[in-house]
Amino acid sequence: MMSENTKVLLETKDLSKYFTAKKGFLNRQPSVVKAVDHVSLSVNKGETLGLVGESGCGKSTLGRTILRLIPATEGQVLYNGENLLAYDKKKMWEMRQKLQIIFQDPYSSLNPRMTVYDLISAPLEVYKVGTKAERREMVEEILQEVGLDRQYLNRFPHEFSGGQRQRIGIARALILNPEFVVCDEAVSALDVSVRAQVLNLMRNMQQKKNLTYLFISHDLSVVRHISDRIAVMYLGSVAEVAPKAQLYSNPMHPYTKALLSAIPLPDVKKRRQRIILEGDVPSAYNPPSGCKFHTRCPYATDRCRQEIPVLRQLEKGHQVACHRAEELV
């Protein structure tokens, strides 16, 4: 969790990732998909920044672009003030010890032919950490920390439940003692009962190892449970960023308001005004001009249709990309 003296660990500046693709057999002109479009975000050391949005909005692409698992089109990724995108292959290889990822599907991300010990110890062997005996001791220790017994070391992934496999994935990601971890839909494939256990495990490991998380999810309830601050994405751009309490009590962007209105209330006697968005999400091949949300926004004006809104601060720590945010509060 964040301390009072917050320090920015990672920051993106106008980070973009564009893909080129052909629209069809007869259309030979390649089109550009702006999966991530000039995103500027900061993540403070020791905090969890939740990243939410509908499927296809660019959340996972942003996380993987930050880690250089896929190349960026333009922009910067500053880690302790240094641009990761300027690193050569050798320097980036060394840096990867500090940057890790927990994947969504714990089964497909684990090699079915490797034992639990081989899976977790692989990063230690790649970076030549310790002797064989020391590596085994480290693997046994991290396995117990994630709630699994060392008797499982010689078993294979298919012998475990989804929750247990994700614990193995977490152990593998944390074995090198990283500083920054991208959690890419890390609990979305799990049953609800197991999901809470894994979330609590991740919070405990964060406090114990002073980790910083970028927690990617489409589930606002899950993000609320684990995050300190939350960023909302729409069609490759950031719509709103705010501390958790502010975002849920006083959302300023119409898209955020619509998302929050869809969350069920635990008290059946309470009612919340549901905001129904008209139309479908525009195609990433041909996004709207101006504000990308204007085609579904009930408050859109001519300015919204023509001018791209800038992510600006309206309250302390609360940023929103909306021309009419002050009027709609």
PLM regions: where:
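Conserved ABC transporter NBD signature motif
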Residues: G75-N83
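P-loop NTP-binding/switch modules centered on Walker-like glycine-rich loops
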Residues: V182, A186-L190, V194-R272
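A short, proline-enriched helix->beta-strand linker immediately N-terminal to the Walker B motif
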Residues: I175-E179
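Conserved ABC ATPase signature
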Residues: F156-F160, Q164
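Short catalytic/signature loops enriched in Gly
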Residues: N5-V8, A21-N27, V32, P243-V329
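Conserved ABC ATPase "signature" region
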Residues: N83, A133-Q151, K257-S261
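Helix-to-loop junction immediately C-terminal to a conserved catalytic motif
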Residues: L67
